[in-house]
Structures are given as C-alpha cells and as structure tokens.
Amino acid sequence: MVEVLGTAEFEEWFLGLSSGDARAVVRGVGLLEAKGLALGFPHSSALGGSRFALRELRVQSSGRPLRIVYAFDPQRQAVLILGGDKTGDDRFYAWAIPKAEAIWEQYLQEAP
C-alpha cells in the first residue's frame, strides 16, 4: 500500500465536486493507494512534456474524463497535485502540466 497525500490545490478542487464525481475520484485514489507505482493504463499514465515524473490518474464519472495530476515524492508517497475535468478542454495538458510543475516544485521545497 502507498500513502496518498493531497495538496491544497487538489483538496480545493475535490471539495467542489458533486457527490458522484467525488465517489469516482475516491475509487480511483483507492486503486492508486493499493497498486502504487504498479498502477498502469487505463487507470494511470505518465504525462509527457514535464520536467518531473508527473502522472495522471484517469477517472471516468458519468462519461466525463476527470484527471488528477500526481507524482511520487522521495518517500514514495503519492501526492495528488491538482485535478480537473478534461471534457471539451483540448488545452487541458497545456495549462495543467505547468501549473502542476509549479505546485510540485513548491511541495518539494517545503517537504521535510
């Protein structure tokens, strides 16, 4: 089992979800917690174009693609960095990756 943490940005997004979307995300996070680094496609995949080893947790809720950008910290904890609804957003990764990288850099600087 892997410990899963969430950043303030992820938690803010999560708290704004509908109950159905939140349940779908919790199921996906449960898979990540159980499988850790071994969680692969279709539930998780690497994000190209990042300076870090960012990954995305791929969740479907009512046919909509919800995505959670995450990474493993030096202690091998999965850190949920941010989330978003990719529905109709052709530029999702163009904004999500740079934002996640900035949050991740700050997380690493502040981590004990």
Report the location of each language-model feature:
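Basic, Lys/Arg-enriched alpha-helical interface segments
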Residues: 1-65, 74-78, 85-112
